[in-house]
Amino acid sequence: MIDQYKHQQLRIGSVSPQQMSAWAKRILPNGEIVGEVTKPYTFHYKTNKPEKDGLFCERIFGPIKSGICACGNYRVIRDKKDDPKFCEQCGVEFIDSRIRRYQMGYIKLACLVTHAWYLKRLPSYIANLLDKPLKELESLVYGDVSFARPVVKKPTFLRLRGSFEYEIQSWKHSIPLFFTTRGFDIFRNREISSGAVAIREQLADLDLRIIMDYSLIEWKELGKEGSPDNENEWEDRKVGRRKNFLVRRIELAKHFIRTNIEPEWMVLCLLPVLPPELRPIIQVDGGKLMSSDINELYRRVIYRNNTLIDLLTTSRSTPGELVICQEKLVQEAVDTLLDNGIRGQPMRDGHNKVYKSFSDIIEGKEGRFRETLLGKRVDYSGRSVIIVGPSLSLHRCGLPGEIAIELFQTFLIRGLIRKHFASNIGIAKSKIRQKEPIVWEILQEVMQGHPVLLNRAPTLHRLGIQAFQPILVEGRAICLHPLVCKGFNADFDGDQMAVHVPLSLEAQAEARLLMFSHTNLLSPAIADPISVPTQDMLIGLYILTSGNRRGIYSNRYNPRNCRNLKNERIPNNNYKYTKKKEPFFCNSYDAIGAYQQKRITFDSPLWLRWRLDLRIISSREVPIEVHYESLGTYHEIYGHYLVVRSIKKQMRSIYIRTNVGHISFYREIEEAVQGFCRAYSYDI
């Protein structure tokens, strides 16, 4: 469907019988209305042609071959009004055969049938709206219980109230006699109801707004009845379950009102028939036919429905029990078609294989939506494993050359022809296959101004697909910055991602303005940061900054390093400041240079000259040691820093005790903050 903003969208929900009939019915040029499937047949066993009014009828669903009718006559498909549009002999229109992919049919049911999704799925929508136990409604639907219809201001013949069991001994012999007695049909139809008819009558009498009001009042009253101090835990649980039920009932009624859906639409009088191309019959080697399970389930419904029609046409001689039993069989056949085995034993074929119902076709990872529609293969797309690219910017991704050449091949051909490296498309493709150096140069130019979209299934929210600026990388895997993984719910243990190329200018503009990864830093649901370090990033940061958190205490005053456990005398040379002299550096560049030259290790403690800090100047911390020098200066050694003072006790310099990991992390943070400040100043 197309909304007011001309956006194509798909909405799934209940529809009225009138809308269902409008979708399935077609009016032929001679005025005949077709669309109802009345026969359970598919193809004729001799001619291999679709049976008329069957599940593959060409009058209902359109011709198998474009422009060829069932008689074999051929007409060119034109728009001229004078040309005959259908065959007068077989009634098949001369139209495109692609109509068989979307043209529906319908089965007119001889009795009302409840939709299994709304009755048997938990929570049951029908039981929720009617506020009745699910078992009672199922017994009513399948004919085990009858329902007394409310008769207003009229005398009642049977004086029944509510539902009553058909198996009660007092009714067991009288009800069949009553049903078959001539002249009592009026009383029977007025005062007794069973099956899906009883469900539909109760749903049609509902006022959704009154349901919402009464449910809200009851919910408020239950909130006041809570037992103090949890005296009766069982009653509290019972009240809690009832309150949760009322909340679900209010939300369901609100949804029905908002979407303009009537509750009685959950009971079917017409059963839609899928287009034939979505439930095909294929001929394999040896002349055998392979059919979709849906066809067999449709045939089962039509067989039982036609049997019920025959019984109803001879109602005067048909026992009422037989009619009720046949209605139950029709209900079960429709349940199997919609959801085989829902809360029961599934139907199987002769090879003990479970039939795939309509629910099995559309649900799950291999269903119609996730595999065929959302996960289908499209042009200008590729797929590969993702690996970590920590050196990438947040808005960049690494694209393997093999994938990039295929995705941007049309752009490469245009670039080669424009720059006169190829005279035609064939020569350009030849150069691309040979992967000449000029191809990589043009590919770099093309990729600089063209974003790509990365998607990881399942796409559960809008951050499941984001835009990136691609760069060429070696190998066959897509490189991704680790900070964007949380939005995709991805990790680097073999996950695969799809890459798409936006072609139109509108798509490229949307990708640049709205979908770039560095513009999607917050969760759209709760506005929390989505680009946060996780897993191996946290481990890396821990290792980078772990170092020695005890300062100089770890070497000098660590009891594990002292041999005083046996009251041994410790030599004075063990009280040196360190076993190995810790180096001093004037700036961070010298420290990193020493690490690169392998003069120190990554976590080796060192002293780094630092700017004067007011917190240290005003600190009243007592130094651990004081080292005096011959020139009169002295060093005050604290737990994590060292102060150099002159003879006049003036603070000359400060050294902090750190390592290369801390220095590297600090520099990264400092550069990021400075870059943010520059960007903020440009915006102002």
From Swiss-Prot:
Entries under InterPro entries matching the protein: DNA-dir_RpoC_beta_prime, RNA_pol_asu, RNA_pol_N, RNA_pol_Rpb1_1, RNA_pol_Rpb1_3_sf, RNA_pol_Rpb1_clamp_domain, RNApol_RpoC1
Comment on bound cofactor: Binds 1 Mg(2+) ion per subunit. Binds 1 Zn(2+) ion per subunit.
Enzyme class of the recorded protein, top EC level: transferase
Keywords: Chloroplast, DNA-directed RNA polymerase, Magnesium, Metal-binding, Nucleotidyltransferase, Plastid, Transcription, Transferase, Zinc
SS bond list: none
Signal peptide start-end: none
Record-listed Zn(2+) binding positions: 69, 71, 87, 90
Location(s), subcellular: Plastid, Chloroplast
Reaction catalysed by this enzyme: RNA(n) + a ribonucleoside 5'-triphosphate = RNA(n+1) + diphosphate
Cofactor: Mg(2+); Zn(2+)
GO MF annotation list: DNA binding; DNA-directed RNA polymerase activity; magnesium ion binding; zinc ion binding
PANTHER family: DNA-DIRECTED RNA POLYMERASE, DNA-DIRECTED RNA POLYMERASE SUBUNIT BETA
Family membership: Belongs to the RNA polymerase beta' chain family. RpoC1 subfamily.
Described function: DNA-dependent RNA polymerase catalyzes the transcription of DNA into RNA using the four ribonucleoside triphosphates as substrates.
Identification of the protein by name: DNA-directed RNA polymerase subunit beta'
Taxon lineage: Eukaryota, Viridiplantae, Streptophyta, Embryophyta, Tracheophyta
UniProt gene name: rpoC1
